[in-house]
From Swiss-Prot:
Cofactor(s) the protein requires to work: Mg(2+)
Role: Involved in mRNA degradation. Catalyzes the phosphorolysis of single-stranded polyribonucleotides processively in the 3'- to 5'-direction.
Family per similarity comment: Belongs to the polyribonucleotide nucleotidyltransferase family.
Enzyme class of the recorded protein, top EC level: transferase
Protein name: Polyribonucleotide nucleotidyltransferase
Annotated organism of origin: Leptospira interrogans serogroup Icterohaemorrhagiae serovar Lai (strain 56601)
Alphabetical keyword list: Cytoplasm, Magnesium, Metal-binding, Nucleotidyltransferase, RNA-binding, Transferase
Subcellular compartments: Cytoplasm
Classification of source organism: Bacteria, Pseudomonadati, Spirochaetota, Spirochaetia, Leptospirales
SMART domains: KH, S1
UniProt binding sites for Mg(2+): 486, 492
Catalytic activity: RNA(n+1) + phosphate = RNA(n) + a ribonucleoside 5'-diphosphate
Principal location: cytoplasm
Length: 698
């Protein structure tokens, strides 16, 4: 039986339909908004796999190019490996949904959202999250939702729910928010240096609309008569837990006072081994031994949180708002165009900048068509950074997500292309990690950009904030969280920005929501921390280097008429190749007539720029030009004075004396100076070497 419901979501009319498509899925919703059609499906295993001790959730967002009537690019003409933007939306779906499944629910769940029909004016991120939540709402899978997603823009100071793609281009805010009826559970986005107050106002605006769509989903589930399946959750053995606590609590408390990550992990591991060995003599059940390991983790959770909430101190002795020690190195690497090392506690990022030309743009395909980006930040998290051994298999979802967040933090302070016409690549190599490596990447990237001579608008710092709370409403906000505090805390909120305001942000929760009072505290405390970090960074470098690295390309930009691009390129690219061969420079010509000229040195670039100018320069009568003899006839020499523009120097005007043969004075390939005597109506150019010599002698 088909069930349909519709409702307003801001300016959009949303239609939800179930029971007609994908009926064997445990939950399936066709989600419509304008011409946008999404299919969201969810399936869950009946039972958890034997020995499963974590929740295996997979969220996949896929864009079908048939949704806009296009073939996929490439040889195979079918969708294959998901591109980065699909991975990022998959993460937006995953992160707010994951903590809302029941504790102890370990059945495998697969959630998929597919774009079947696209609308060029509709941004998909918020809608994809809504479709995913709706599929869970109509399924029998246990889920403490529903939730809703909202993409928020701000144009001319006015907040907009689910802005169009055109509105986003003019927006100083691009925010994706997920929430329940009463609380925010996830935020992510970028801003053009907005204040804390402006950010909170945007979140309040989002929450109001989120509540509307949550209500619509609740009505829909009630209309369908959804009954959730009964599942066996992992039941705690209170007697065994009590025995483990009695034996291990004091030992774990002592081990947790060790500030060094490596030493602490070793001590915790030793305690865990000791406890397991102690109980092995009395417990033969292997599942019970696994339970003991889980209970030890629970005790550690309790110890760390109790210390923060009752004593106001942290495992490493820091105050709640205290930042770890920071050190900075500028240009430690001689070869790259710019580099910096940013170390905060036991987290260390090496930021490296490479400057390139238009041909280095990253090209990618979206539903809107082929796109290019001239700034990219790549984040690498090798196993050695946390002292582990594992196979290297390229960037995963986490690396892509962290890199994107750091990229968004920095891209809004970059100079405009006409001020600094370089393609810029930043790579963050995480050399060691103990929490907040993405924000360390922001700091090292900002420092490296300045070291490379990129005139950014201001230094950017980033900080990760944590939250510990209890059922009574008591909470503590932590600045610059370490890995342990991220693991055992309720929140991981990353905020980056300049002294003027916020440029990027991301918040994930492990609880079912956070109040606006808490959020205001987080943003205010984060600002103090960011400014402290900026103070240290700016002691080392506070403005861009005045010179580029010797190995960086030199770029000159010219703008030519669009209808004359073909003249510059020449038949089969002859003219462009000729310029490159003569100067050693490379030319990158865009459809709008922008010509980027890059040379290995300034002389090479300037020589090529002069030749480009020559193609579009008008011949001036009375001006002396330096030209190349292209061919010789009995009656004179043809001289190229500008690219593609030849004139005739008659034999009578080659020299002061009588000339019997042109070849007696000039030969093909000679560079000579000639004066333009006349340009007739047909464009024929009359040249004189004799007049040029005479004028220069005077």
């Amino acid at each position: 039986m088909t069930h349909t419901i519709s409702g307003q979501y801001g300016r959009d009319t949303i239609v939800l339909e179930t029971g007609s498509w994908a009926k064997q899925a445990h939950g399936a919703v066709v989600y419509k908004s304008g011409n946008l059609v999404l299919l969201a499906t969810v399936c869950a295993a009946d039972e958890a796999k034997e020995g499963q001790d974590f929740f295996p959730l997979t969220c996949e967002y896929t864009e079908k190019l048939y949704s806009v009537g296009r073939f996929p690019g490439g040889y195979f003409k079918r969708e294959a490996k998901p591109p980065e933007h699909e991975i990022l939306i998959s993460r937006i779906i995953d992160r707010p949904i994951r903590p809302l499944f029941p504790e102890g629910y370990f059945c495998e769940v697969q959630l998929q959202v597919q774009v079947l029909s696209a609308d060029g004016d509709v941004s998909v991120a918020g809608h994809a999250l809504n479709a995913a939540s709706a599929a869970l709402a109509v399924s029998d899978i246990p889920f403490n939702g529903p939730i809703a997603g909202a993409r928020i823009g701000r144009v001319n100071g006015e907040l907009i729910l689910n802005p169009t793609t055109k509105e986003i281009l003019n927006s100083d805010l691009d925010l994706v928010v997920a929430g329940t009826k009463t609380h925010i559970v996830m935020i992510e986005g970028e801003a053009k240096e907005l204040s804390n107050e402006e950010m909170i106002a945007a979140l309040r605006f989002a929450q109001k609309h989120i509540a509307e769509f949550v209500t619509l989903q609740e009505e829909y589930a009630k209309k369908i008569g959804v009954v959730k399946r009964e599942v066996k959750l992992k039941v705690r053995d209170e007697e065994l837990l009590s025995k483990v606590k009695e034996y291990a609590f004091a030992k774990l408390t002592t081990a947790n006072q060790t500030p060094d990550k490596t030493a602490r992990n070793k001590e915790i591991s030793n305690v865990n081994k000791e406890v397991v060995e102690f109980f092995k003599d009395t417990i033969e059940d292997s599942d019970k031994i696994k339970d003991i390991k889980a209970y030890l983790h629970e005790l550690e959770y309790e110890i760390v949180r109790e210390q923060v909430l009752t004593k106001g101190t942290r495992f490493d002795g820091r105050k709640l708002d205290e930042i770890r020690s920071i050190s900075v190195e500028i240009n430690p690497l001689p070869g790259p165009h710019g580099s910096a090392v940013f170390t905060r506690g036991q987290t260390q990022s090496l930021g490296v900048v490479t400057l390139g030309t238009g041909s280095d743009n990253q090209r990618y395909e979206t539903l809107e068509g082929q796109k290019e980006k001239s700034f990219m930040l790549h984040y690498n998290f090798p196993a050695f950074s946390v002292g582990e051994v594992r196979r290297s298999s390229g960037p995963g979802r986490r690396e892509i997500g962290h890199g994107n967040l750091a990229e968004r933090a920095l891209k809004l302070v970059l100079p405009k292309p006409d001020e600094f016409p370089y393609v810029i690549r930043v790579v963050s190599e995480i050399l060691e990690s103990n929490g907040s490596s993405s924000m360390a990447s922001v700091c090292s990237g900002s420092l490296a950009l300045m070291a490379a001579g990129v005139p950014i608008q201001g230094s950017v710092s980033g900080i990760a904030m944590g939250l510990f709370s209890d059922s009574s409403g008591k909470y503590a906000v932590l600045s610059d969280i370490a890995g342990l505090e991220d693991h055992f805390g309720d929140m991981d909120c990353k905020i980056a920005g300049t002294r003027k305001g916020i440029t990027a942000f991301q918040m994930d929760l492990k609880v079912t929501g956070v109040s606006f009072d808490v959020l205001e505290s987080v943003f205010e405390q984060a600002q103090r921390g960011r400014f402290h970090i900026l103070d240290i960074m700016e002691k080392h470098i506070s403005k861009a280097s005045s010179t580029l690295a010797g190995t960086a390309p030199r770029i000159i930009v010219r703008n030519i008429p669009k209808d004359r691009i073909g003249e510059l390129i020449g038949p089969g690219g002859k003219n462009v190749r000729g310029i490159s061969e003569l100067t050693g420079a490379e030319l990158y010509i865009e459809d709008d007539g922008k010509v980027t000229i890059s040379g290995s040195n300034q002389e090479s670039a300037e020589k090529a720029a002069k030749m480009v100018d020559g193609f579009f320069a008008e011949v001036e009568v009375g001006k002396i030009y330096e030209g190349k003899v292209k061919r010789i006839a009995d009656f004179g020499a043809f001289v190229e004075i500008l690219p593609g523009k030849e004139g005739l120097c008659h034999i009578s005007k080659i020299d002061f004396k009588r000339v019997n043969s042109v070849k007696d004075i000039v030969k093909e390939g000679d560079i000579i100076r000639v004066k333009v005597l006349n340009v007739d109506k047909t464009g024929k150019i009359d040249l004189s070497r004799k007049d040029a010599l005479e004028e220069e002698q005077v």
